[in-house]
Amino acid sequence: MNIVKTSDPSRPAGADGLNERVHLIPLGHEIDRAVKPFNTYRAERAYVIVVPDNADLDEQMLEKQRHYTKRVCEGLLAVGVRPDVAYCNMFDILDVLRVVSSLIVREKRQGNDVLINMSACGRMTSVPVTMAAMVHGVTAYYVHADRYATGDDAAFEADHGLSIVETGRVEPLYNFSIMMPDAECQLLLCELYRRGQGMTSEDLLDFCHMKGFEGYDKLPPEKKNKSGEYSSGPKNRELLNRTNRKYLHKLEAAGYITRIWSGRRFSVHITDAGRYIACVSGLL
């Protein structure tokens, strides 16, 4: 199996130049629900997304997860699907959004078709998984269980996972549109998320200049007595007005940022809602 770091640069498409069909499988204690869909769906590759080996979990739980990961990868290879293992904190909604969305964006940029199995993980994890699918317009699907490895069937868990799938019924979920901020606003939210602290007006102008946003090619002159601050004047006012009009007012109205004032100066901070948008953007 291949180990994938979600921060790796995009990998080249298939050697034959054809688009691939790629599945994302956030995995808990399941086998059948991860493998049986390939009796219905064609795929060249699948990402098996699991907790990292050094996760802060009981060693017995980690060993159990390694078992399921190994069995699923073996099952995928048996049906001609190449598994790639990616790691994620499956108990952190923001990290699930970040990892799943970045993989979706990576594969879509290569022109590949992406499908997401939202039923092979825990209930809490399935929420951000489905949200990421809808934001990026890819198909999420649910694999129905015929029975569960409990009671008299508990002995089947090691070979089937918690859910026993016999009929292999797969139900696609129908997407509804989730409105996202425009591309430049998403970049700004991601920068706020990365910094983990506020951005001053100078930080904002520098960021817009660095990213090549329209109208920010020339910045105001710096004050002589205060390093890093820009002199007040027509150019400074023009760029601050542009920043407010194009980005800050919209993000504030949506509840994605907040401003903290200190006298006549302010700093911009990302809100909890803004963190969700940054993570689901696929840009982190």
Language-model segments: residues:
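Long, low-complexity, Lys/Arg-enriched
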Residues: M1-D113, V127-L284
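Short glycine-rich phosphate-binding loop at a beta-alpha junction
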Residues: D113-S119
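Polyanion-engaging groove/track-forming segments
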Residues: C121-R123
